């Protein structure tokens, strides 16, 4: 093989290897940051993956907030007005967190009716609701 042609082939193969590695790293990073959204009904139905990072949204059920006597542990229930799941969280809750409030929790499903949250997000004002929660709740009201 001609030395010039061989050098061009080597450079091309090297560039393709570098680009492939970069693409693989980008896809791996994106895969680690993707959090799919589920409703309490989907979790109860077993549609949500167990032990995978997901988001769940709904309304905090009335009289369901139970705080530990010591520490920052909190347990509460969220509902989509069809099904309810228990959420456990250890940390400081947002100031806007309260019963009847729309929230999105990030964490893992431990079983069909329990969710362990690592982050809890509350809506910012009276008119805001995450689009996924709004559409899921609208579907439940229409039925």
Curated annotation (Swiss-Prot):
One of its GO terms (biological process) is cytochrome complex assembly. Signal peptide: none annotated. One of its GO terms (cellular component) is plasma membrane. The chain crosses the membrane at residues 9-29. InterPro entries: CcmE, CcmE-like_sf, NA-bd_OB-fold. Heme binds at residues 124, 128. GO terms for molecular function: heme binding; metal ion binding. It is a single-pass type II membrane protein. It is found in: Cell inner membrane. Residues 1-8 are cytoplasmic. Gene3D superfamilies: Nucleic acid-binding proteins. Heme chaperone required for the biogenesis of c-type cytochromes. Transiently binds heme delivered by CcmC and transfers the heme to apo-cytochromes in a process facilitated by CcmF and CcmH. Belongs to the CcmE/CycJ family. This is Cytochrome c-type biogenesis protein CcmE.
